[in-house]
A protein has these predicted regions:
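Non-catalytic N-terminal regions of enzymes
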Residues: 1-203
Length: 203
């Protein structure tokens, strides 16, 4: 049986946009969004990068910056912090962000072979399942129909590399939007401040 590369979860956290920066917001769906309503499968993606330091160094130096920069980035992508909701009072579903809504961020550690997983060759897809997070319901909004839109997982392969796993609802995010979001997060993380506007700051 193929090795499934189990991971050790070290931390679960909830990351929100900066408090009071947005207020409550409602965003209606467009005609083109309707096609992607659940039960359509989630978008899942993995981003690999080499990292030649220890888990201790990452957790104490890099991860706090990732959390802070993610919070700043979510201010510009606030629907991803919210939910897709559809209650009896609504004639159609909509994106709903309530101040304090958050994205799930998981920190994990793996003893798997980073270079094998990130290499340009055929691999067993089962080895990747543990690197992407799951989307779990939240009780912050009406439970009749409330779906979180984004979850993130950072898996560290000590002295080898890191993998950022993304699970997102396709109704809120396609591949192009995901790449735009990841570039924005990387830009804020590198600069240490919210230096966007996004359209001009991201290559």
């Amino acid at each position: 049986m193929a090795h499934t590369n189990p991971v050790k979860v070290l931390e679960h956290c909830k990351i929100s946009p900066p408090p009071g920066s947005l207020g409550n917001k409602i965003l209606p769906l467009t005609f083109f969004d309707i096609f992607w309503l659940p039960p359509y499968p989630h978008v899942k993606a993995l981003f690999f990068s080499e990292y030649s330091y220890s888990m201790h160094h990452f957790k104490n130096t890099i991860f706090p910056n990732l959390k802070h920069s993610l919070s700043l980035t979510l201010r510009h992508f606030y629907p991803l912090s919210g939910h897709l909701v559809w209650s009896q009072e609504l004639s159609e579903p909509e994106f709903c962000y309530i101040d304090g809504d958050s994205v799930s961020l998981t920190l994990a550690e793996s003893d798997g072979d980073f270079h094998h997983l990130s290499g340009n060759h055929a691999r067993d897809v089962n080895q990747f399942h543990c690197l992407v997070p799951t989307l779990t319901p939240s009780s912050m909004v009406d439970p009749e129909f409330s779906i979180p839109l984004l979850a993130l997982q950072v898996t560290v392969f000590p002295n080898s590399g890191i993998c950022i796993g993304v699970t997102a609802s396709h109704v809120a995010l396609d591949a192009r939007t995901l790449v735009h979001f990841m570039k924005a997060w990387a830009s804020v993380s590198e600069s240490g401040v919210d230096s966007l506007p996004l359209d001009s700051a991201i290559p």
